Amino acid sequence: MFGLGAPELILILILALIIFGPGKLPEVGRALGKGIREFKNATNSVTEEIKEAAKIDDGNNNSDKEKATRQAS
């Protein structure tokens, strides 16, 4: 996971606890989780759009090739 071991993760958690405090830490964790989830959804959406565009392009290229083959015959 990003080359982070247990000692690094513990250090990050301790720093977060010092910076945000124990009362605010769950709220920060929820917000961070929500942000990561939204980012993943957005990247998945873009990936799917690119795949769909590639499929459409492949379909158009194949039909153009077929037309060229028919015209050459």
Curated annotation (Swiss-Prot):
Localization (cell): Cell membrane
Membrane topology according to the record: Single-pass membrane protein
One GO cellular component term noted in the UniProt record for this chain: TAT protein transport complex
TM region positions: 1-21
Coiled-coil ranges per UniProt: none
InterPro entries from the UniProt entry: TatA/B/E (IPR003369), TatA/E (IPR006312)
Gene Ontology annotations of biological process type: protein transport by the Tat complex
Main subcellular location of this protein, as a coarse class: membrane
Keywords attached to this entry: Cell membrane, Membrane, Protein transport, Translocation, Transmembrane, Transmembrane helix, Transport
Residue segments, region Disordered: 52-73
GO molecular function: protein transmembrane transporter activity
Protein family: Belongs to the TatA/E family.
Summary of subunit composition and partner proteins: Forms a complex with TatC.
Record function comment: Part of the twin-arginine translocation (Tat) system that transports large folded proteins containing a characteristic twin-arginine motif in their signal peptide across membranes. TatA could form the protein-conducting channel of the Tat system.
Protein name, as recorded: Sec-independent protein translocase protein TatA
Source organism of this protein record: Moorella thermoacetica (strain ATCC 39073 / JCM 9320)
Record gene name: tatA
